Swiss-Prot record:
Organism per entry: Danio rerio (Zebrafish)
Pfam families: Tetraspanin
Family: Belongs to the tetraspanin (TM4SF) family.
Record's subcellular location: Golgi apparatus membrane; Endoplasmic reticulum membrane
Stretches assigned to the Lumenal side: 31-49, 106-208
Record-given protein name: Tetraspanin-36
Keyword Nucleotidyltransferase: no
Length: 243
């Protein structure tokens, strides 16, 4: 039996099984990106940032299906099945490349998007509205204060109306004596939220892009394996694939 065919069939069978696990992994990654975005959506004006995540989840659903198709086609040595398997892999490969490109594009646009929206959200802080809850969540979760730093609060109406203090969410954890006075910097988180949120979103997108790239490489070898089996079968149709 041709070693190329044996190797290719083995790769395809493993690839088909991996597709199920990969589908679950991609679904998790896509959901993680969307969840991370939703946690801070008040500070993001461009919802197109979610395009890579949407593509990832769509690919995950399809991968569950083609994992089954791939197993059946490889075991039964069906040329039609293998051809269909190859087409689907190529489509998924193209979708993953597209998601990767979108990830690169929107990774470079995060800072500009944050700069446009964060100042507006912080200026609307009044202690009661939805922007207030978003800012408090951001500052407490990321341990930051203000857009660039804690002094940004001096430009807000909140600061003037509350005895020149910043919100309690600017206080360091477990600092019960913190009153929000800028004269007590040791009790406050002094790093700006824009830089921290940008880093969080950059890390999330980078993680997603690495996963996409890894699975795209697997798909590439899968396409090569299908081509090897198909070509060898045409040349040796009289010879069974298994002895």
């Amino acid at each position: 039996m041709d070693c190329g065919i044996i190797t290719s069939k083995t790769i395809l069978l493993l690839l088909s099984l991996i597709f199920w696990a990969a589908g679950a992994a991609l679904a998790y990654v896509g959901s993680y990106v969307i969840k991370s975005y939703n946690n801070f959506e008040d500070f993001m004006s461009d919802r197109h940032t979610l395009i890579p995540a949407a593509i990832i989840i769509g690919v995950a659903v399809v991968m569950f299906i083609i994992g089954f198709v791939g197993c059946c086609a490889t075991l039964r040595e069906s040329k039609v099945g293998l051809g269909l398997f190859l087409i689907i892999i190529m489509l998924i490969f193209a979708a993953e490349v597209t998601a990767f490109v979108f990830g690169i594009i929107y990774r470079g646009r995060i800072r500009g998007d944050l700069e446009k929206s964060m100042n507006d959200v912080f200026l609307k802080y009044d202690g009661l509205n939805s922007e207030t809850h978003a800012v408090d969540y951001l500052q407490s979760q990321l341990e930051c204060c203000g857009v660039k730093n804690q002094t940004d609060w001096t430009l807000t109406s909140w600061f003037a109306q509350h005895n020149n203090t910043v919100p309690q969410s600017c206080c360091k954890a477990n600092m019960t004596q913190c009153t929000g006075q800028l004269s007590q910097p040791d009790l406050l988180n002094t790093q700006g939220c824009e830089a921290k949120l940008e880093q969080v979103l950059q890390d999330v997108l980078s993680y997603a892009m690495l996963v996409i790239l890894g699975f795209a490489i697997i798909k590439f070898f899968g396409m090569l394996s299908v081509c090897v089996i198909t070509c060898k079968s045409k040349k040796n149709e009289y010879q069974p694939l298994y002895a």
